[in-house]
């Protein structure tokens, strides 16, 4: 084992290897490294490879006598293939420092941040970075796991550079790269194969990636086997469908491709269709079709009442009435009842169609004197409605003009029957008994349903029309007042900025009679949080200032009743203070109603709607938009800009 002093002697010239060839793990121009376990060198043989920080000296010579100053060699300019980012530089700096510390630890020296001080007093001190750890791009070392495994191999022996150099056998030396040889990049490792994807294109990960709406739920909730069709089975003229590899999930199909659900051949071949059965596969009113349009089986409903006071002038805009600000989305069904309606009923319906737009159609409308009711439904839901039936009741016999009475409209949607009644009861502060009589006449005289069968005849009563339907909404001008007089009510209205509505409702005649059970048996009303809707000065926000001084009251109401508890959920209940063309303020309610599947053995409406009104409303809507744009253009062109 040569001593440390002997290793510090200057090296003798050694035979050069052939040009253009560099041994792996060996520096160009340096003698080959001695393998571990080999016998010591014979006289005249090449000296073993030394650490880069100490020059090699032949054995048997006096170091002071043969020591010669070594001229420092300037480092070769590295060839940069690309600009390095701060992250790459930091990574290279950390890897270089860690490799230097590992090499110094193997030699038993202390880390010195990239330079090794020689211990000989006369030996020159210089820093040497291992060539294989250059910062050029083609000399990036392998991962730490590869380096650590190769450092521990016995072939590295006592040469501190052998482990590092052997970890990158294909990397050329920096001197060779500078000399003009083409850089040799290490072979790229093959990328890891991606995880296998299921044929279900409606998986949770893909739904998140494609941002599929959560409300577009699959109408086939049961599991089905995978469906894989060959391209040849689609026919020569039909392109391949992206749903060929889908397994029963139509959720992604409806959001990415089409709302039209594919029909499977095995479902067509199966003879599972039973007329009048709730379990019929593919039935128009069955559970599958209901789940396709309403996954939660809840339909959004808008019910409103307004006493127009016979005014011919309609408000310029009905957006606040039909499209309230608290509703983010339009409803599926709109039912509007009017008392003392305007003389031009067709104009009123046209304004409703114009406001709701082309997404809605007039399913049915009826009139009884000046009582109007209009029923608008989404255009794509008209196929699931039965025939619409109506009935009327007159409560004031002696009157030539039917201003008091009731109007009812009924139909079945899927398997749920609906009844809508709008009424105008007797007016007057003290005529509570007459209003109770109007209610009794209405529930007994309305003849509904006629042709459409009752969904549950065992729970129906011949004496009460409201018991023959699943969901009942009764709304109108009931004319029930606040008892106590104008002075008491005004005192409660003028207490402060926030009106004590519960204190006002303690004087309400309707709530008092409903608690007694004398009217609207089984009905409920949403919580009231708005001011009394009657009686206002026309065009103003002040209550009656005439000599009659009528007491402000909640005359306009919306009530509901259901055969099954919890089927009707009120969402909002309010009035429209912005519509001031009448002495009444419109009152509306938003509801969520549960719908059940039905049977196909009922008479259907067959998609009928008022097409003439639909076209008229759309033309009116377009013409107003054109007029608005022309007004904006004329305003911009007439603007005068003067510079003083």
Swiss-Prot record:
Tissue-level expression reads: Detected in brain, heart, pancreas, testis and spleen.
* Positions of region (Disordered): 1-193
**GO biological process per UniProt:** cilium assembly; negative regulation of phosphatidylinositol 3-kinase/protein kinase B signal transduction; negative regulation of protein localization to cilium; negative regulation of translation; phosphatidylinositol biosynthetic process; phosphatidylinositol dephosphorylation; response to inositol
Q: Where is the composition biased (Polar residues)?
A: 107-118
Query: Positions of the sequence repeats?
Result: 10-13, 15-18, 28-31, 39-42, 55-58, 69-71, 72-74, 75-78, 121-124, 169-172, 183-185, 190-193, 236-239
> How is this protein positioned relative to the membrane?
Peripheral membrane protein
Propeptide at which positions? 642-644
Q: Which reaction does it catalyse?
A: a 1,2-diacyl-sn-glycero-3-phospho-(1D-myo-inositol-4,5-bisphosphate) + H2O = a 1,2-diacyl-sn-glycero-3-phospho-(1D-myo-inositol 4-phosphate) + phosphate; a 1,2-diacyl-sn-glycero-3-phospho-(1D-myo-inositol-3,4,5-trisphosphate) + H2O = a 1,2-diacyl-sn-glycero-3-phospho-(1D-myo-inositol-3,4-bisphosphate) + phosphate; a 1,2-diacyl-sn-glycero-3-phospho-(1D-myo-inositol-3,5-bisphosphate) + H2O = a 1,2-diacyl-sn-glycero-3-phospho-(1D-myo-inositol-3-phosphate) + phosphate
Lipid moiety-binding residues (S-farnesyl cysteine): 641
> For the modification Cysteine methyl ester, which residues carry it?
641
Q: How is its activity regulated?
A: Active in the presence of octyl-glucoside or Triton X-100, but completely inhibited by CTAB.
**Do you know which Gene3D superfamilies this protein is assigned to?**
Endonuclease/exonuclease/phosphatase
Q: Which residues form the signal peptide?
A: none
Q: Where are the compositionally biased (Low complexity) regions? A: 152-163
EC number(s): the record gives: 3.1.3.36, 3.1.3.86
Q: Where is the composition biased (Basic and acidic residues)?
A: 78-90
Subunit structure, interactors included = Interacts (when prenylated) with PDE6D; this is important for normal location in cilia.
Give the disease entry from the UniProt record.
Joubert syndrome 1: A disorder presenting with cerebellar ataxia, oculomotor apraxia, hypotonia, neonatal breathing abnormalities and psychomotor delay. Neuroradiologically, it is characterized by cerebellar vermian hypoplasia/aplasia, thickened and reoriented superior cerebellar peduncles, and an abnormally large interpeduncular fossa, giving the appearance of a molar tooth on transaxial slices (molar tooth sign). Additional variable features include retinal dystrophy and renal disease.
The text of the family note is:
Belongs to the inositol 1,4,5-trisphosphate 5-phosphatase type IV family.
This chain belongs to the protein called Phosphatidylinositol polyphosphate 5-phosphatase type IV
Species assigned in the record: Homo sapiens
Lineage, please?
Eukaryota, Metazoa, Chordata, Craniata, Vertebrata
